[in-house]
Amino acid sequence: HGAGNLGRQAALLAGLPITTSGVTVNRFCSSGLQTIATAANYVRNDGADVVVAGGVESLSFPGGGGSMQNNDPKLAQQYPAIFMPMIDTADIVAERYKISREYQDEFSLESQRRMAAAQQANKFADEIVPMATKMKVVNKETKEESIVDYVVNRDECNRPDTTLEGLAKLAPVRGEGKFITAGNA
């Protein structure tokens, strides 16, 4: 999002001294997880006493991460697959390894159920730091917008009311004959 070295900015905004280093890791969907693995490596192998790790992935504002306009034309010509969107990769893998749409929907449903049960049991309470923010609320009837104070204290992207029937009704993103939908991606 044009944030430059976001890791360094976060360190400074957290009140750490200017002598504190910061590293930004971009791995799209798994950047946060990768930073934790990298931090563990610094502690285990490099003798670091303290390392802070985190991620800023956003499903509501993903940015333009993989758009072709940001890719080197020579690389795109020589190795087009490295710029392939994940949705296309997932469809190819499903077709190649004969992973049916039905199986993917069943797997997704089970994942949703497990997430709902974990949230109900507060399994992530020690791992998610509540974050105060502002949220834009749009009235669906009047379209009136307002900004409200809000605390994010849990993953809000899961759908605990998901059903197999609902998943089956979703059209594949890349069209008929493909596998990946908004519900099983």
Task: Describe these PLM feature segments.
Residues 46-75:
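Glycine/threonine-rich beta-strand-loop-alpha-helix active-site module
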Residues 1-49, 69, 80-88, 160-185:
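Conserved catalytic cysteine-centered active-site region
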